[in-house]
Structure formats: C-alpha cells, structure tokens
C-alpha cells in the first residue's frame, strides 16, 4: 500500500469513528422495539453428555495450470461421544480437469458429495449429524426447469458417477443432481438427526435489515439463547434430480441463530423438527468451545489444507515454486 493511503486514513480516522457510532445508534433504534420478540434468552438446566455426534467437513487444494486444473478434495467424518473421539473415516479424490468452464463449481460439489456420502454411510450409528454449512447451500441454488433422470436409480456412497460425464456443462448438472440425491436420501430417512451449522450466515430473514441477522444479534445481545424459529419451504425449482424433487419438494425446514455461551459469537442452525430445539441446545451446549461446537472445529482442522500441506503437494508433484518471495503467484 502506498504511503498516501495511510496519510488519508489518519485524516479520516475521527470521521470514521463518528460515522460508526451514528450507524450503530440508528441501527439500535430501528431494532430495539422488536428485539425482545425475536431473541429468546435460554440456557438449558440440564445437558446431554452421552449423545453420539457425527461431525463432517471437507477441504480442498486447487491449482490451475496451463494444462488443466489439478485438485485434491478430502472429507472426514468423526464420531464423538461428548468431546471424546470414538472413531473416524475419510474420503479423498485426486483428479485433473482440462481447462474449461465451471471447474471451481464442480470441485466444490465433489467435496460436498464426499461429505454427504460419509453422512449417509455412518448416520445410522449416531444420534445426530453435524454438517458444516446451511441446508440451502447443501441443496444448491441452481434454478432449472429441466430435471435430470439418469442418476435417479443409483444412490452411491462409494462412487461418483458424474465424473464419467465428459461434457463440462452436463457434468455440472449431474454433480448437482447427485448431491441432491444423496441429500434427499439423508433427509427422507434421517431428517430428525440432521443439524446444519453455519458460522457466517448472511441471512436477513429475521430483522429485514441491510445487516445480517447474526450481525444485529451479536451487536445487541449477550446472553445464551436463540432467535425466533423461522420456517422455509423447499422450492422444487432448485432441485435438478427428479427423484430428489419427489422426496424434498414442499418439505419444510426450520432455522434459528444460537448462542451457546454468554457474549460469544452466534451461529445459524438449520433443522427439520422445530419441537426438538431444546433437545438440540442440550446436546450442543456441552460440546461448545467459545460458543461453537467443538466436533466441527476438530474435523475442520483435520481437513483444512495448510501451508505445510501445500508445500508437500508441490514437492510430490514436482511443481515449480517461486524463486522470489514477493513475486505474485499468478505470474508463475
């Protein structure tokens, strides 16, 4: 950054502070009358220590080269009893796409599919499944009037059938449908066990403000509790798989924002049984670490691709590294 930018920042500092205070005050005035209706202070008197929780997350490494897009996706599922690990299982896919369209979208869908396959494989032996990300993100936001039928008779927990498709556009559609097929199987058979957890939700359904609901609640509440439970209907226009559409269309799911520890951050929880909200709080509170479920923190740490991982990948693939440390990566 050039020196002039710092000079301007020093000049503007007081104005920024004044404007920040004004914005905070105006926001407070606009929500204070409804805050008590939309936020419920609650901390369970008793908690459930003995429930088996399955925490699932995925990670990826992607490198675009002139020849194609090389990537590694991995997903892991850990079974916890309280905060104690009982066992775990992982899935990995190493692949290369030729240069073309939708590479990033397809890779993200592949990672998610590994997560959902693990969930479907292990769900029967646990009480609850903790999935990273909202239900709507898992379902996908790809509107289409054309349904995909080719995969409807096959729900695999081991293979990824969409990779057999060579056309990039078709592969993307098939991956969306394959994700939705596995997700619909999970929901239709085990929906009361599924908890979708988002730490960075941008939803504004509650307060209808320009700021996210979580931002407002973190600014103006400190106690443990949850926000008013809202209901959403699954829109079949977002479901490409015809079989998944039959299983999911018109089904309702619910969401709220939780705080498990005083003054800590909130997260959004999506679920299918509104009557079990107190049960969910009893289960999640004893595994909370600074307000977030520890099982998801642990599994995220295991699948995240860190600096040492990247260096090792480059070494194995014998890929050229930068000779000049400050040289922008896009130029080598």
Curated annotation (Swiss-Prot):
Naturally occurring in which organism (per UniProt): Sulfolobus acidocaldarius (strain ATCC 33909 / DSM 639 / JCM 8929 / NBRC 15157 / NCIMB 11770)
One example of a Gene Ontology biological process annotation: DNA repair
The UniProt record lists the keyword Cell membrane: no
Official protein name in the record: DNA double-strand break repair nuclease NurA
Top-level class of the enzyme under EC nomenclature: hydrolase
InterPro entries documented for this protein: DSB_repair_nuclease_NurA (IPR053461), NurA_domain (IPR018977)
The family this protein is said to belong to: Belongs to the NurA family.
Keywords, ordered alphabetically: DNA damage, DNA repair, DNA-binding, Endonuclease, Exonuclease, Hydrolase, Manganese, Metal-binding, Nuclease
Molecular function terms from GO: endonuclease activity; exonuclease activity; metal ion binding
Highest taxon of the lineage: Archaea
Binding site for Mn(2+): 57, 132
Biological function: Involved in DNA double-strand break (DSB) repair. Probably acts with HerA to stimulate resection of the 5' strand and produce the long 3' single-strand that is required for RadA loading. Exhibits both single-stranded endonuclease activity and 5'-3' exonuclease activity on single-stranded and double-stranded DNA.
Cofactor(s) annotated in UniProt: Mn(2+)
Protein encoded by which gene: nurA
């Amino acid at each position: 950054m050039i020196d002039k930018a710092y000079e301007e920042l020093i000049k503007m500092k007081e104005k920024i502070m004044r404007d920040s205070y004004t914005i905070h005050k105006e926001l407070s005035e606009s929500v204070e009358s409804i805050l008590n209706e939309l936020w419920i202070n609650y901390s369970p008197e008793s908690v459930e220590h003995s429930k088996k929780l399955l925490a699932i997350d995925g990670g990826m490494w992607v490198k675009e080269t002139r020849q194609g897009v090389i990537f590694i996706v991995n997903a892991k599922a850990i079974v916890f009893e309280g905060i104690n690990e009982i066992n775990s299982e992982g899935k990995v896919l190493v692949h290369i796409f030729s240069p073309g369209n939708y590479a990033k979208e397809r890779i993200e869908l592949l990672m998610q599919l590994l997560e959902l396959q693990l969930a479907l494989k292990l769900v029967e032996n646990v009480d609850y499944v903790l999935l990273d990300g909202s239900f709507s993100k898992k379902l996908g936001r790809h509107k289409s009037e054309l349904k995909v039928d080719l995969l409807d008779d096959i729900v695999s927990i081991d293979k990824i059938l969409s990779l057999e498709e060579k056309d990039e556009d078709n592969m993307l559609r098939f991956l969306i449908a394959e994700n939705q097929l596995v997700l619909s199987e999970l929901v239709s058979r085990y929906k009361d066990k599924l908890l979708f957890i988002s730490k960075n939700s941008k939803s504004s359904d509650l307060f209808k403000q320009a700021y996210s609901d979580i931002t407002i609640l973190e600014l103006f509440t400190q106690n443990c509790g949850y926000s008013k439970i809202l209901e959403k209907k699954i829109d079949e226009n977002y479901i490409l798989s015809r079989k998944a559409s039959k299983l999911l269309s018109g089904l309702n799911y619910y969401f709220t924002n939780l705080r498990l520890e005083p003054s800590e951050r909130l997260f959004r929880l999506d679920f299918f049984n509104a009557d079990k909200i107190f049960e969910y709080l009893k289960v999640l509170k004893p595994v909370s670490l600074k307000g977030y479920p520890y099982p998801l923190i642990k599994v995220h740490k295991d699948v995240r691709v860190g600096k040492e991982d990247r260096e090792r990948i480059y070494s194995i693939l014998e890929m050229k590294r930068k000779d000049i440390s400050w040289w922008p990566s896009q130029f080598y």
